[in-house]
């Protein structure tokens, strides 16, 4: 479980919301309950999203016609501080029923930041340029090689914290 970031596409199998990963060489989303490369909290977060989308009847993005609201769920966890950021990537500048979602997400240990990212472009680029903080901080903080980094959804940061630290320390030698 070495990855500190995940970007899950959100779609529909025709009946239910699917949150997971693209099937090889396609844009068909395979629902994934857990990924052993990512922190355990990520599975709990995606479960909360699945239930929220179903219960509140939130529309999911349809790539072919550009309709629907929820496009991706983007999650980061700072390895050293344990802080977690959840970013809802939406095809709209507002999402209905976020209060119910936030109420559940804020109960997760380490939850620090819940952000809405707006991406109305008909593109396969995950994040749009605009972010709105829905709850908590607009960034999480992590440490790498003794330095502190404030990470927003738009920040670049190595997904393998420990591997990056080894490489950077080797480069310093």
Language-model segment annotations:
Residues 1-173:
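Accessory RNA-recognition modules of RNA-modification enzymes
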């Amino acid at each position: 479980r070495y990855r500190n970031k995940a970007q899950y596409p959100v779609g529909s199998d025709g009946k239910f919301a699917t949150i997971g990963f693209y099937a090889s060489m396609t844009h068909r989303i395979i629902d994934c309950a857990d990924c052993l490369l990512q922190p355990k909290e990520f599975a709990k977060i995606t479960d909360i999203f699945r239930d929220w989308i179903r219960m509140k009847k939130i529309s999911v993005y349809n790539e072919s016609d550009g309709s629907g609201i929820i496009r991706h769920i983007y999650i980061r966890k700072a390895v050293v501080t344990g802080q977690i950021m959840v970013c809802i990537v939406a095809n709209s500048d507002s999402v209905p029923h976020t209060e119910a979602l936030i109420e559940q997400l804020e109960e997760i240990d380490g939850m620090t930041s819940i952000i809405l990212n707006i991406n109305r472009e008909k593109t396969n680029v995950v994040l749009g340029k605009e972010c709105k903080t829905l709850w908590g901080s607009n960034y999480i903080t992590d440490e790498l090689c003794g330095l502190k980094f404030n990470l927003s959804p738009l920040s670049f940061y190595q997904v393998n914290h420990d591997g990056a630290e080894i490489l950077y320390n080797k480069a310093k030698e």
